[in-house]
Amino acid sequence: MNKPQTPMMRQYLSIKAKYKDEILFFRLGDFYEMFFDEAVEVSRILNLTLTKRNDVPMCGIPYHAAKIYIARLLRAGKKIAICEQVTEPVAGGLTERKVVEVITPGTVAEDDFLEQGSNNYLAAVYCSNKKTEGNSGFDYYAGLAYIDVTTGNFFATSFPKTDFKEQFLKEIGRINPKEILIQQSIQNEFPALKQILSEFPSMMQNFYPDWSFNPDQAEKRLCSTFGTENLKGFLLNTDSPEVPPAGLLLQYLEEISGRDISHISGIKIYAESDFVSLDDSTRKNLELLTNLRDNSPSYSLFESVNYTKTAMGTRLLRRRISYPLRSKNEIDKRLDKVNSLFKDGKASAIIRETLSSILDIERLSGRIAMQKTHGKDLLALKQSLNSVIRMGSLIEEKKLNFLQLNDEEKKLLTEIRDLLENSIDDDCTIALNDGKLIKKGFSKKVDTIKNIKENAHEILEKYLDDERKKTGINNLKIKYNRMMGYFLEVSLGNISAVPDYFIRQRSLSNADRFTTESLKQIEDNINNSEERLIEAEKEVFDEVCTEIGSHHCFLQKLAEEVAELDVNQSFAQAAVLHAWTRPELCSDSGILNITGGRHPVVENHLRAGDFVPNSIKLLSGENSNPEDETIPSFAVITGPNMAGKSTFLRQTALICLLAQIGSFVPAEKAVLSPVDKIFCRVGATDNLARGESTFLVEMIETAYILNSATRNSLVIMDEVGRGTSMEDGLAIAQAVSEHLLNTIKAKTLFATHYHELTRLEHEKIINLKLDVLEAEGKIVFLKKVVHGAAGNSYGIHVAGLAGIPQSVLTRAENLLYMRSQFQKERTIQEARPSAQGSEEKTPSSPAEKGLSLFPEEELILNEILSTDPDETAPIKALQLIASWKNRLSGK
């Protein structure tokens, strides 16, 4: 039989029924308590002690430390509902409680729960069920919208539903939202959705029915928020696939947070064709924002170029790295700005120092507009605006192309700064109830109350002095006790002089006590001055915030200008510190010509001068200029492990990417034609959760490249074909090479240990190798890329460096010697003249022709070495020998 529930538990269950998806923080005195399965889950996530009361699992956290635990739950992708006590506890009665706030990973606005240098995006995705005109013509489209409520940044894009899996994964990987709203029917339409979402385990997922994505309602909500009659100014209409998810985001923000979101004043629409395409594998393999080892920013490209001084600049730098430009003109505009700071080191140093004193204007103004702020925020904004004004004067003097404000905007900037200077007390705290919020002289009402609070004794003394003069009672006194409060005491000898407006309160043996209406008012003012001061200051503070919030659009624009300046000075600083050069961009030529290129990350972690620079020159296939026919488009790169192949591959891709985000590059010289896509297939791991082997993952990535690359792409491939038999791997590697070379004609760097590929003959192929110095049985990796094909992979040497036992190394050397001797014998036999009248056998099928570069004897030798005589049945052995004999004789 179930035990009867207490009134408090019935109250908990009643509130919990309304917040089924949230973790309910139920306030009990000085703790927030959780119960039942929720307590079990929270105790596991937060590593709390799980207890029981009346067989009910429970755990709790101190309310004063709640922010620490809330932050951890948000990072784990959880929603939290804060349930507070809203009435004072009554003996024997039940305290009233209600949910005062719901916090979710994508709607949180408090600094304590945010990463300063990263956006906190809330996203929504929708698939249209009717054809519309979009970036790729007339088609069925999916729309993706995402917003950072803390900054007001609002973006949306669309892509054909036929590309949903690739494009959705690509965009989600780029923006890394903390929370996403998903159209329910997408699960059925795209079974791969579950697979994609599993890649982002900490991203909170909310599924909404299709009717929630109503285009008409979404358009109305967007227009209402933006204050416009239609969405034409944002290149949108009711049929745009971006509209339904964007509208739902605003609805969700209003419902969950209950805040004013009027600071969200517009939305930026973009197309994939505006930016370089970077698939998920490429972003990870190039370690753009995080490294592959521990997923931290250390040893990433972001770390190598991040010399930003503001949180806004850091966030913009992340976005620029994730979204390189395709347009030569836009890239050159960015490079011009970097160059202006690169050339003027003195101005750049002053700008860097000034930027260091600018706080997060984007999020400060966002919190002010949402009325989620305090006095310290306003002081931080004032400090930041002062720094912007100082920096603006220097920029004008130097005629630099930054902080482009017109006269009206400059005036507004000064007015906002002056309002903050005059209104907010420099000694204020984050508390809004300590009476130290509003500066003296700004509000007459506040000043009056402060005067009463701070000068109560002087006010009473002045009143007493006035009454003495009016009554002529020189020994009139003001006294105080808890029972009567303040009162006037008149000695019996002066009772006859007491005026009519004195109100008798009590008679004593030697004196009488009186009050007056004026004294009552003074007492009331003194007793209530603290409460009245808090109310008055809060009223004035809200007025100041409302005024500043009304200029959020301007402050957001100002923040964007500061962020852009910060990113450009960061690029200039990287160029100065690491001797980077400005790349030269060429339109549509397909050229990639890097002289003395270096890996930006590896070089940063070596001693100065230790990194060995290398050059590469490639040109996309099919060029009209006859002189260009001698420039290769496809580089086959061979060399030992640890010689530097992967570093060379990645540095080439990173130099291209750096150029297209508008940065100088680590090279003596770089002449580049902007690429439309960068593919980087280097290394692979299995995906056991999906049932995918390492080889299958590699083939999936390779297939995506072959189906997506264009002539204007840059393709980086390392060790294609490994993970299967040598015959299959070699065949796949050659077939992939031929397709890239003859069909796609993209600029390609193809690293391999299949040395047979170096025998491919084509006017657009170049063989490159990593040079090695061999002397006295030892080898030195020179890290230098030179023309030619490697003759040895030195795998046994590298195995020795890794600590493989000497007995194993010796056996490997013997096997390698046997194989090389066998190969020599075959070479001698092939060199002998053929019998008179005999004809050379030619391949009889396309498949045989495709494999003509792969010596049959090497394949057979590999089979012999892998066959164990002790484990092979006699009949099987005879069959193998007959097969080898026939293949060697060409039958």
Curated annotation (Swiss-Prot):
GO MF annotation terms: ATP binding; ATP-dependent DNA damage sensor activity; damaged DNA binding; mismatched DNA binding
Binding site for ATP: 639-646
Stretch list, region Disordered: 827-854
SMART domains linked to this entry: MUTSac, MUTSd
Alphabetized UniProt keyword annotations: ATP-binding, DNA damage, DNA repair, DNA-binding, Nucleotide-binding
GO BP annotations, alphabetical order: mismatch repair
Annotated InterPro entries: DNA_mismatch_repair_MutS, DNA_mismatch_repair_MutS-lik_N, DNA_mismatch_repair_MutS/MSH, DNA_mismatch_repair_MutS_C, DNA_mismatch_repair_MutS_clamp, DNA_mismatch_repair_MutS_core, DNA_mismatch_repair_MutS_N, DNA_mismatch_repair_MutS_sf
Any single Pfam family the record assigns to this protein: MutS_V
Cited Gene3D superfamilies: 1.10.1420.10, DNA repair protein MutS, domain I, MutS, connector domain, P-loop containing nucleotide triphosphate hydrolases
One Gene Ontology cellular component: cytosol
Lineage top rank: taxon: Bacteria
Family to which this protein belongs: Belongs to the DNA mismatch repair MutS family.
Task performed by this protein: This protein is involved in the repair of mismatches in DNA. It is possible that it carries out the mismatch recognition step. This protein has a weak ATPase activity.
UniProt-recorded name of the protein: DNA mismatch repair protein MutS
Protein's gene: mutS
